[in-house]
């Protein structure tokens, strides 16, 4: 379902109040009209990346929320041009979804890391880390955590994975984008 384009008919516009649930909607919320199977367990969709009330919205599914206490799932939909990662989505739906009561799958992931090297006897040596989940080797990197910027993430990840404190080279920043198994769209920034 991640990455699909859907049409949402808004039933609860942003800033509306549901007296029955005692809930003020920070996002537009509605039912999915098209883009998914008619027998899908989708119970509704939150719309991110739109800062005004809308009646109908067509966008891309960027997250799937599955509540632990009940059947069905909720989608998070955004304009194609917008990218939101897990902590941004969790913050946006916090008005309706209590932390720890759901599982979330996201379309987008963002990681940061660094090319760590040192020169010994005129020879440049690079630090590579073996990924535990695969046979791949790479530079130390990891997901951006809530409240971090890219450089803070890179610094923390190198320290956690290698126990090394690093200095950044001025004006070096490389960004790579790729797809993981055709399901997750990942962006990696390396310093």
Where are these regions (language model features)?
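N-terminal strand-loop-strand
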Residues: 105-139
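A contiguous binding-surface segment within folded domains or other stable secondary-structure elements
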Residues: 134, 145, 163
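Hydrophobic alpha-helical positions that pack around
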Residues: 140, 154, 158
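Active-site segment of metal-dependent pyrophosphate-handling enzymes
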Residues: 159, 163-191
């Amino acid at each position: 379902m991640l990455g699909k384009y859907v049409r949402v008919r808004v039933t609860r516009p942003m800033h509306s109040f549901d007296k029955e649930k005692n809930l003020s909607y920070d996002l537009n919320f509605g039912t999915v009209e098209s883009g998914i199977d008619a027998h899908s367990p989708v119970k509704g969709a939150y719309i991110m990346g739109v800062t005004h009330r809308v009646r109908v919205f067509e966008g891309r599914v960027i997250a799937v929320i599955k509540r632990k206490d009940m059947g069905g799932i909720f989608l998070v939909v955004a304009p194609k041009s917008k990218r939101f990662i897990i902590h941004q989505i969790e913050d946006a739906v916090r008005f309706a979804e209590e932390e720890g009561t759901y599982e979330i799958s996201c379309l987008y992931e963002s990681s940061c890391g660094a090319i760590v090297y040192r020169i010994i006897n005129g020879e440049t040596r690079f630090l590579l880390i073996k990924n535990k989940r695969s046979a791949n080797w790479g530079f130390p990197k990891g997901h951006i955590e809530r409240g971090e910027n890219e450089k803070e993430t890179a610094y923390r990840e190198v320290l956690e994975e290698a126990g090394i404190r690093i200095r950044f080279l001025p004006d070096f920043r490389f960004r790579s984008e790729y797809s993981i198994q055709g399901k997750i769209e990942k962006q990696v920034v390396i310093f």
